[in-house]
Curated annotation (Swiss-Prot):
GO terms for cellular component: plasma membrane; proton-transporting ATP synthase complex. The keyword Isomerase does not apply. This is ATP synthase subunit a. Belongs to the ATPase A chain family. F-type ATPases have 2 components, CF(1) - the catalytic core - and CF(0) - the membrane proton channel. CF(1) has five subunits: alpha(3), beta(3), gamma(1), delta(1), epsilon(1). CF(0) has three main subunits: a(1), b(2) and c(9-12). The alpha and beta chains form an alternating ring which encloses part of the gamma chain. CF(1) is attached to CF(0) by a central stalk formed by the gamma and epsilon chains, while a peripheral stalk is formed by the delta and b chains. The gene is atpB. The keyword Repeat does not apply.
Amino acid sequence: MTESILAAQIEVGEHHTATWLGMTVNTDTVLSTAIAALIVLALAFYLRSKVTSTAVPGGVQLFFEAITIQMRGQVESAIGMRIAPFVLPLAVTIFVFILISNWLSVLPVQYTDEHGQTTELLKPAAADINYVLALALFVFVCYHAAGIWRRGIVGHPIKLLKGHVAILAPINLVEEIAKPISLSLRLFGNIFAGGILVALIALFPPYIMWAPNAIWKSFDLFVGAIQAFIFALLTILYFSQAMELEEDHH
């Protein structure tokens, strides 16, 4: 089996690169991310037009309203505090963006490269560490900016380090630094592992390869949804912790 894997020359984590303005970029990740962003923007404008119209709300609008209301209720009851009005739409947008960028890889869009190998055109963006780290750092910067806006430029760092027990300040600092790392690696690890399994399935004989590949692709849709949901849920939790005041508790 080991010899077969080596002979197949499986390249997991490899990306097609190009140089733009002196910078090396992963073009497959950029393509998947750009398509996902366009879909999210189109969906946002569509929902906006439905909200401002006088017609009866459509199924898509009712679906997202139900998700938003249900998520708000569950999160607030779980963490015991109210969340800022802008946090939930941001988290839902991140959820949809991650979900679409990962689900694009399920589409049977392939091409033959210069070496004669068949390659997927749309790869899961979260299999690129640069993508997930950029998302995690974006969330990290945003919730700290929100915390400074709510608590003050002095009050936020003090509350952040002190927490509920001042003696735990060093541990709180390490925990805060680890948040973007754990947030990104959790998403990256699960999607990257899926890419490895797809590469191993490619070693099956052609006449039976479709069966395990179809089963895994179906499961991959579920994994992508769960990981996008966890990322969005942790985003809400981090914002709530950063903006927490004593009077916010129920």
